[in-house]
A protein has these predicted regions:
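Cationic, amphipathic, low-complexity segments that mediate targeting or membrane/lipid association
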Residues: 8-9
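Bacterial N-terminal signal peptides
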Residues: 55-63
Length: 266
């Protein structure tokens, strides 16, 4: 039996497979050893077709194992929370995502309540999927998305307060991003919108007046606008107090839509 396995294993195309997936060989050898006494495989004389069927079984088992997402402990301090976000983004930008806490067990775990360790005020732009770009799972980040990541409204600040006061997040990130359509429209001298969009652009425009008509300064306008939102949040005494007491970090950041990387601005 073992000789038959060695013969098939030595065939070039199968040897190539095992070089690529060594764990599959270990599983198949285990199957052979455990079934040798019952002479199950002797019925087929371990021909190539049977062996490839066993390989298929090995792949199924390996796939099921890979579907069990790795778990990591959640951060317990503001500094750890920020580090976890940045580490997750590094994994994302390097195509090494682990997709933690994203299975049905996590769905069931978070169904009764949420306890995110971070909050992110980001843009509504479809190119900025917050949980994905930080490689975080279900219930990890409280996400507040508005056009232009603007916090200049009671509704948005109400969401920020909820994250800080009731959910107890340890870090709040205001995330601007490259090629932001809201800021682009706000600094464009030729833009004429109506209704709600006009009101939205006026709100952003108030923060970037020095850049109106200067399309070449878009990136500077985006960075400035992001910093203004952080200043606006920090102007609330209860937020500033938590930061001063070491209970919370409030940071501005920038997401590069070309590279997938997040950079802190302060």
């Amino acid at each position: 039996m073992t000789n038959n396995l060695a013969k098939v294993e030595s065939q070039p195309e199968i040897s190539l497979f095992f070089n690529e997936y060594p764990s599959a060989l270990g599983l198949i050898k285990l199957l052979v050893v455990n079934t040798e006494k019952n002479e199950i495989f002797l019925l087929m004389n371990m021909n190539k077709k049977l062996f490839l069927n066993v390989i298929g079984l090995a792949i199924v088992v390996m796939t099921c194992t890979m579907c069990q997402r790795p778990t990591t402990s959640l951060p317990s301090s503001p500094e750890e929370a920020l580090a976890e976000l940045l580490a997750g983004n590094e994994r994302y930008a390097n195509e090494q995502c682990i997709n933690p806490r994203s299975d049905m067990d996590r769905v069931e775990e978070t169904a009764p309540h949420q306890a995110p360790f971070a909050a992110v005020v980001g843009c509504s732009d479809s190119r900025v999927p917050v949980e994905l770009l930080f490689d975080q799972g279900i219930g990890d980040i409280f996400v507040i998305r508005t056009a232009g990541n603007n916090v200049n409204s009671e509704m948005v600040m109400g969401s920020v307060d909820y994250a800080i006061e009731h959910l107890g997040v340890k870090v709040l990130l205001v995330l601007g991003h490259g090629s932001c359509g809201g800021v682009t429209a706000a600094i464009s001298a030729g833009e004429h919108e109506h209704g709600n969009i006009a009101h939205l652009l006026d709100t952003i425009r108030n923060d970037v007046r020095d850049y109106i008509g200067k399309a070449e300064s878009l990136d500077k306008a985006i960075l400035h606008h992001t910093l203004v939102q952080v200043d606006r949040i920090m102007a609330y005494p209860h937020v500033a107090e938590k930061v001063e007491n070491g209970e919370l970090l409030v940071k501005p950041a920038y997401y590069d839509v070309n590279t997938g990387k997040v950079s802190l601005l302060q």
